Regions:
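Short glycine/threonine-rich loop-to-helix capping motif typified by GTGT followed
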Residues: 107-112, 144, 257-259, 291-306
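Helical element adjacent to the flavin cofactor pocket in flavoenzyme catalytic cores
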Residues: 29, 61-121, 126-127
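Surface-exposed helix-capping loop/turn segments at secondary-structure junctions
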Residues: 35, 90-96, 108, 180, ...
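Rossmann-like flavin
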Residues: 1-54
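Flavin-binding catalytic cores
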Residues: 177-178, 205, 209-219, 260-295
Length: 309
């Protein structure tokens, strides 16, 4: 295509084409030597929900290094961002419905003209109808079979979610922020915007993938932050909040419902590991709660298998 032709004209362009043909894992193993650097690059790339074994995505590693985008946090918390977006929609004449479950997409003369809710209400539009739901919900559940080409239905049925996408979350209310032991020599660590714990070597990536493939819980590698260090408005005066996330399989031990019995103990395990690095957490945790990939799917059904995308 035109892009390929343009890239072929320069050495850097040809280099990009060559890198793109590899998987992120191959790129890191072939271009970097230090085990910790390899592990870190793969971990950060994995946070972007790219399957690190997938050929055709090798360029995602140099794109990660060259990109100007940094981790960000919304002042007031994620709810403040949601409230700002909804306020803007309403200001421009839009309407938002919550707890309204769609039953079908209404079709007329070969085009979508509205949706019908499970309570029987119909909402129509003279403009266009857009779906932000997953492929199975949109093309197999909400649209009738005669409204979707068979090839599209087959593609939707065959869509596979990212093996490493599901997240497990530990959230804590604190009397004070974590104080890391390593900060005695490197005080800036207590002001880190993001902390990664448990990541030591490249082989851990393979162990995590294998654990996900077999529905097992791998040795913990987690990342998180203490948002109130940067935005005190997210907690009562003098108090703090913190969180850690870990990529864990949806169907743990073969069945996602197993998370109901395992969730709290795994959260305690994460907190113990966190306290190994920040010992004051043994004394300052006021309360905590956990959230598994199954919990995500239960509250947000469009995130099938807990896939956040």
């Amino acid at each position: 295509d035109q892009r390929q032709q343009l890239l072929q004209r320069s050495a850097l362009g040809r280099r990009l084409i060559e890198a793109s043909q590899r998987s992120p894992l191959e790129f890191v193993e072939q271009e970097f030597e230090h085990d910790a650097v390899r592990a870190g690059l793969l971990f950060f790339n994995g946070l972007r929900e790219v399957d690190l074994r997938m050929h055709g995505f090798g360029h995602s590693i140099p794109a990660l290094l060259a990109g100007s985008n940094m981790a960000q946090m919304c002042r007031g918390g994620a709810v403040a961002l949601a409230e700002a977006l909804t306020a803007d929609i309403r200001e421009h004449g839009g309407e938002i419905r919550t707890s309204a479950e769609p039953q079908s997409i209404l079709m007329q003369n070969g085009r979508a003209v509205g949706i019908e809710l499970t309570d029987g209400e119909r909402l129509t539009s003279e403009g266009f109808i857009a779906s932000g739901l997953n492929p199975q919900q949109t093309f197999l559940k909400l649209l009738s079979a005669d409204a979707v080409p068979q090839t599209v239905r087959e593609q939707a049925a065959g869509f596979r979610y990212n093996l490493l996408a599901p997240l497990f979350g530990l959230n804590v209310a604190l009397d004070e922020p974590p104080q890391y032991s390593a900060a005695e020599k490197h005080p800036e660590l207590n002001d880190a915007f993001m902390v990664i714990l448990g990541l030591e070597r490249l082989d851990q990536f393979h162990e995590i993938v294998t654990a996900h493939e077999h529905g097992r819980i791998p040795p913990t590698v987690m990342w998180g932050a203490c948002p109130t260090v940067f935005d005190p408005s997210q907690a009562p005066a003098g108090k703090h909040t913190g969180f850690m996330w870990e990529k864990l399989p949806y169907a743990v031990n073969g069945d996602p419902k197993n998370w109901d019995a395992l969730r709290e103990e795994h959260g305690r395990s994460m907190l113990r590991l966190w306290a190994d690095y920040a010992p004051n957490l043994n004394e300052v945790v006021l309360d905590s709660f956990t959230r598994s990939a199954l919990d995500t799917e239960r509250s947000l059904p469009n995130m099938q298998f807990g896939d956040l995308l």
